[in-house]
Design a protein with these regions (language model features):
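A conserved beta-strand-loop-helix scaffold within acyl/acetyltransferase catalytic domains
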Residues: 26-35
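C-terminal structural segments of small proteins and small subunits
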Residues: 61-93
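Conserved N-terminal entry element of GNAT/NAT acetyltransferase domains
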Residues: 1-7
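Structural motif
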Residues: 8-10, 31
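Conserved beta-hairpin
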Residues: 12-23
Length: 93
């Protein structure tokens, strides 16, 4: 699966189109220049199919590319980062 992650700063979220207008989203805020990942949402009917992990991968890759520091308050994003040590250098707090 390849992800197409877009930052939507007006809505403070990263978006991943899933087809038919559906989106997987990761909500965030900005605190002291760091991206605080708050909540991840995948449509219920698509849960358990790996879209959350695909979204997390795309979000962390985007943040790494952009040189951002991250606080993962979202339990899903925090768990994903813990299982993927390559993103450890991005994490604060």
């Amino acid at each position: 699966m390849e992800s197409d992650i877009r930052d939507n700063p007006a809505m403070s979220r990263f978006e991943m189109p899933l087809g038919d207008g559906a989106l997987a989203v990761a909500y965030y805020s900005i605190e002291d220049g760091r991206v605080v990942l708050l909540h991840t949402d995948v449509p219920h009917e698509l849960s358990g199919l790996g879209y959350g992990s695909l979204l997390a991968h795309g979000v962390f890759e985007t943040l790494r590319r952009d040189g951002k520091r991250v606080i993962a308050k979202c339990p899903f994003m925090s768990s994903y980062a813990a299982r993927h040590p390559e993103y450890g250098a991005l994490l604060d707090g």
